[in-house]
Amino acid sequence: MQGRLSAWLVKHGLVHRSLGFDYQGIETLQIKSEDWHSIAVISYVYGYNYLRSQCAYDVAPGGLLASVYHLTRIQYGVDQPEEVCIKVFAARRNPRIPSVFWIWKSADFQERESYDMLGISYDNHPRLKRILMPESWIGWPLRKDYIAPNFYEIQDAH
């Protein structure tokens, strides 16, 4: 079984992998990092013009990092939204994923938070810098292999 977007991508020869459906019937697709920008543009044109959320997580210690996008398409009315979840995986050593800021402006702070917490660089993001941690912070706090410092110097907390 395929969702509408997945079927459309297959029909047009665009490489992706379906990871199945969740309990609400929302399909999850895996997209390669190098294909993400073009598929994001296609998704927007296809009608997925609302980015509900973007988040990221560490798949496993020493393993891949994932950036997750929840897209919504409202074609027949607000009571019948069509949703899709897209996962883009990146290597831990140099995690780079194309930014979708220029497609969905709401990705701005969400991609910055993923960068700040996990170190995923979003190519062509206009303001990719730390948003939660101080600029001087070393490391990526939400990575499973992150070693927390023995002390925290809170200078700017006033």
From Swiss-Prot:
One of its GO terms (molecular function) is quinone binding. It is an enzyme of class 7 (translocase). It catalyses: a plastoquinone + NADH + (n+1) H(+)(in) = a plastoquinol + NAD(+) + n H(+)(out); a plastoquinone + NADPH + (n+1) H(+)(in) = a plastoquinol + NADP(+) + n H(+)(out). The keyword Electron transport does not apply. NDH shuttles electrons from NAD(P)H:plastoquinone, via FMN and iron-sulfur (Fe-S) centers, to quinones in the photosynthetic chain and possibly in a chloroplast respiratory chain. The immediate electron acceptor for the enzyme in this species is believed to be plastoquinone. Couples the redox reaction to proton translocation, and thus conserves the redox energy in a proton gradient. NCBIfam families: PRK12494.1. It is found in: Plastid, Chloroplast thylakoid membrane. Belongs to the complex I 30 kDa subunit family. Its EC number is 7.1.1.-. NDH is composed of at least 16 different subunits, 5 of which are encoded in the nucleus. The keyword Translocase applies. This is NAD(P)H-quinone oxidoreductase subunit J, chloroplastic. Keywords: Chloroplast, Membrane, NAD, NADP, Plastid, Plastoquinone, Quinone, Thylakoid, Translocase, Transport. The lineage of its organism: Eukaryota, Viridiplantae, Streptophyta, Embryophyta, Tracheophyta. InterPro entries: NADH_DH_suC, NADH_quin_OxRdtase_su_C/D-like, NADH_UbQ_OxRdtase_30kDa_su, NADH_UbQ_OxRdtase_CS. It is a peripheral membrane protein. One of its GO terms (biological process) is photosynthesis, light reaction. GO terms for cellular component: chloroplast thylakoid membrane.
